[in-house]
Amino acid sequence: MTRKFLHTSDLARAVGVHPNTVRKYADWGLNPPVERTPSGYRLFTQQHLDCMRLARLIYSAPYPGRGFRALGNEIVQHAVMYDWQGALEKAHEYLAIVRAELQNAEGAADLLEHWVQNMVSISGNESPLAIGEVSKLLGVSIDVIRNAERNGLITVPRNTYNNYRLFGKREIERLRIIRMLGKAGYSHMAILRMFLELDKGNIRDLKKTLDTPRPDEDIFTAADRWLTTLRAQETMARQVIELINEITAS
């Protein structure tokens, strides 16, 4: 039976991109090798269109970091090698990782509310600690603590005699929440945004504040709205699984 070939323009129309983008996907290895006519025209097949649809779906989502892009690349490469079962397995792995990250991020944001309530009852009568002592207590480097201070996440009082930092209970607890939110994937900008509201006495909707850039934040990353990013990744992963199942069923 004669194979049905598709032209560059056919793929471009099917996925809604410029023809040059189709050529780039082939050059970048996001499509299987492409046959050419004696005159040099590319001859695509349904396999190329399927891979193009898959790659467009994966790469159209915001880049979240934390190894997601590498796993997305693996899904595409399995498809390029005609290994749709391998692509499906990797897609399910992707979805499981995203859901675990989302659960972790949601849990950290929920713990934030509990922390805020406890902060109200914290007294400042304990003997302050030096930065090295805080580093050992929290299991973070001194540079991490200094970086939090430089980025405005914490203000640390100083000894009037030697200018050494003095970390009281409030500062230490604030560093704990910075560490927790950072490990959960939230950016320094998101944490700072939350603290700015908290320091003004606004203790409601801090979870929403973590996920909502202010109007003056002209440039922001995926981690500046981490919950939204992860939910978008979850949706994308489910769509990838549906697409692969559709392709293999046809």
Residue map of PLM features:
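Short helix-capping and hinge/turn segments at secondary-structure transitions, especially at repeat
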Residues: K136-D143, R150-N159, I172, M180-S187
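Arg/Lys-rich, alpha-helical DNA-contact motif
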Residues: T2-V15, D27-P38, R42-S127, K169-S250
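Major-groove DNA-recognition helix of helix-turn-helix-type DNA-binding domains
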Residues: P19-P38, S141-N162
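Ligand/cofactor pocket segment of small-molecule handling proteins
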Residues: S127-E133, G152
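Short alpha-helical "recognition helix" segments of helix-turn-helix
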Residues: L11-A12, V134-K136, A148, I191
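Residues within the helices of the helix-turn-helix
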Residues: T8-S9, R23, G132, R146
